């Protein structure tokens, strides 16, 4: 039954930590210089080699350089007013500790080099989607999901071309590898049995592209536009069920047929997004940034998992493992960011920014693996250049969300779960850029 959670194996891809500075399942932590301004102006400010992700056209404004870094994420999640019921109406026993997202780091790396006066080449490695969560063993909502670890790692070779001194374009194909493992429980309490354990794994490699344009509208105003394509996966993996049974010999013979390892597959498309931003150089000291990002989360309406060799049991269980459709009903979102940078002296630049990022999911469709709500982020950052060849960027960000509800109904093999989630997170990033 829990093969429905294979859907999230492809979907649940927010930081390698489960919480990040973007909403839904996306990650923003591909740049620490951008993190300091809440990623405002990401498409219009080619500050370093991380522009390979932000806007590949920005490489035309760089020399030969490498940028390496990462962001550390510490999430705080409180669960309130929780309750769980079996389909029979009896209460699901268990705890609701919260803080199920472990601390972790999101790494990235980029390299840019000129080929000639107009052509640049670059290579980037980063994480665009990820999820890690690990509820306690006795979590009351364990039938809806208990442990998740999913990552997408992207490699992006990139070229840019300077059309004029004011306009450049860039393009990069993306090679995207998705891998994940998910654990959850299913119940046979109505048949005199206890909890069974379900482990799901799957992977795939798929391809997409990023394309961008960067233009100086005036001597002080720069506009950038970046498109990140959708990526279509066909995940293949396995679902293993263990521990299904009953003290009743008749039911035990039936439920025992659920135990086994099944081949499964699903088609999944992770959405495209478009970022438009402006960078305005107010004077020699101040630079202002503004940006908006549209993400087509409405691609995630429903997903069907197909499994081979699954048993058909009498009602009410039936063949719950054969073909399972999970409804998501996500909606498109617009996120917005404003930021500023102050050049304190030739060596130091100070940054600040704020962003608002709506959730793509409503209370009716939210689940325990991705319990996200409308999000706001405030960030501070600094860049230190002790030499012309080296810059060290650091950034801190705090995000908080509107309180959200999870409402999941029970069925024959899953206990239902209802709770309120209060989510926040701290992010700390560091990045080294070296020019040579």
Q: Model-found features: residue ranges?
A:
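Gram-negative bacterial Sec-dependent N-terminal signal peptides
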Residues: 1-22
């Amino acid at each position: 039954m829990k093969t429905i959670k294979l859907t999230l194996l492809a979907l649940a891809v927010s930081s390698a930590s489960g919480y990040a500075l973007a909403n839904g399942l996306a990650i923003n932590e591909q740049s620490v210089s951008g993190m300091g301004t809440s990623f405002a102006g990401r498409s219009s400010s080619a500050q370093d080699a991380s522009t390979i992700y932000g806007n590949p056209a920005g490489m035309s404004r760089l020399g030969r350089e490498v940028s390496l870094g990462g962001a550390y994420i510490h999430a705080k999640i409180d669960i309130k007013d929780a309750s769980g019921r079996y389909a029979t109406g009896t209460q699901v026993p268990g705890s609701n500790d919260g803080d199920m997202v472990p601390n972790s780091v999101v790494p990235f790396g980029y390299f840019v080099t000129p080929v000639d006066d107009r052509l640049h080449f670059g290579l980037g490695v980063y994480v665009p989607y990820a999820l890690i969560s690990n509820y306690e063993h006795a979590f009351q909502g364990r039938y809806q999901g208990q442990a998740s670890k999913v990552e997408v790692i992207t490699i992006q070779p990139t070229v840019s071309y300077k059309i004029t001194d004011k306009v450049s374009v860039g393009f990069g194909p993306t090679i995207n590898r998705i891998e994940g493992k998910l654990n959850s429980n299913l119940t046979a309490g109505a048949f005199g049995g206890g909890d069974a354990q379900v482990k799901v794994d799957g992977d795939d490699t798929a391809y997409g592209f990023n394309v961008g344009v960067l233009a100086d509208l005036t001597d002080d105003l720069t506009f950038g536009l970046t498109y990140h394509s959708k990526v279509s996966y066909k995940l293949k993996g396995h679902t293993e069920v263990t521990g299904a049974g009953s003290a009743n010999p008749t039911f035990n013979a039936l439920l025992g047929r659920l135990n086994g390892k099944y081949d499964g597959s699903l088609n999944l498309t992770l959405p495209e997004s478009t970022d438009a931003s402006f960078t305005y150089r107010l004077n020699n000291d101040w630079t202002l940034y503004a940006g908006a990002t549209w993400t087509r989360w409405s691609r995630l309406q429903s997903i069907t998992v197909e499994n081979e060799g699954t048993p058909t049991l009498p009602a009410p269980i039936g063949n719950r493992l054969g073909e399972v459709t999970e409804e998501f009903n996500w909606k498109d979102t617009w996120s917005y960011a404003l930021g500023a940078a102050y050049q304190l002296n030739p060596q130091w630049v100070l940054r600040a920014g704020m962003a608002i990022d709506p959730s793509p999911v409503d209370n009716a469709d939210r689940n325990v693996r991705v319990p996200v709500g409308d999000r706001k982020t405030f960030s501070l950052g600094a860049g230190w250049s002790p030499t012309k060849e080296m810059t060290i960027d650091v950034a801190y960000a705090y995000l908080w969300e509107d309180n959200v509800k999870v409402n999941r109904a029970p069925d024959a093999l899953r206990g239902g779960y209802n709770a309120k989630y209060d989510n926040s997170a701290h992010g700390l990033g560091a990045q080294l850029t070296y020019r040579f």
